[in-house]
Curated annotation (Swiss-Prot):
It comes from Pseudomonas syringae pv. tomato (strain ATCC BAA-871 / DC3000). Responsible for the release of ribosomes from messenger RNA at the termination of protein biosynthesis. May increase the efficiency of translation by recycling ribosomes from one round of translation to another. GO terms for cellular component: cytosol. Disulfide bonds: none annotated. This is Ribosome-recycling factor. GO terms for biological process: cytoplasmic translational termination. Pfam families: RRF.
């Protein structure tokens, strides 16, 4: 029972870390990478569809993305969706494909993106702490139901705390790495 609680907490904490890593891919650095456009939704036959399902996004060079729509008549809709996405991109329509040049990050935008990264990291830390709280609550319930002793509960609580400390440290490493990527000129 104790092992199940610890395993569940570890799995959920790992998912929080993965969620943070995924959130970091949406924050752009100075380099071009297709995942920057991952959140762009394109109107396709009346429904908003992810860009990846209506077009192929590739890296042309370190500062340029190339977008090729699967259907040529969708190119204008893809262009408009990218412009209105709030990412600050203005695609160049070449008839068969779109080119998106990544503007250089100013000091102000770097600081804004760094703040976004820190906010995402704080959300992940809060999620990990909430998972710890849930696990400790489950352990206390087991003691209350006399399924485990208080000593076992204390040992398991220490293990859960060590797990929490490990994941909080991993989050810290991830945010420091993202900040370094953002501040690199």
């Amino acid at each position: 029972m104790i092992n199940e609680i610890k395993k569940d907490a570890q799995t959920r904490m790992q998912k929080s870390l993965e969620s943070l890593t995924h959130a970091f891919t949406r924050i752009r650095t100075g380099k071009a990478h297709p995942s920057i456009l991952g959140g762009v939704m394109v109107p396709y036959y009346g429904a908003d569809t992810p860009l990846s399902q209506v077009a192929n996004v590739t890296v042309k060079d370190s500062r340029t993305l190339q977008v090729v729509a699967f259907e040529r008549n969708m190119l204008a809709a893809v262009d408009k969706a990218i412009q209105s996405s709030g990412l600050g991109f203005n695609p160049t329509n070449l008839g068969e494909l779109l080119l998106i040049s990544m503007p250089a990050l100013t000091e102000e935008t770097r600081k804004g993106f760094t703040k976004q990264a820190r906010d995402a990291a704080e959300d992940a830390r809060v999620a990990v702490r909430n998972i710890r709280r849930d696990a400790l609550s489950q352990l206390k319930d087991l003691v209350k139901d006399k399924e485990i002793s208080e000593d076992e509960e204390r040992r398991a609580a220490d293990d859960v705390q060590k797990l929490t400390d490990k994941f909080v440290a991993d989050i810290e490493v991830a945010v420091k790495q993202k900040e370094a990527d953002l501040m690199a000129v």
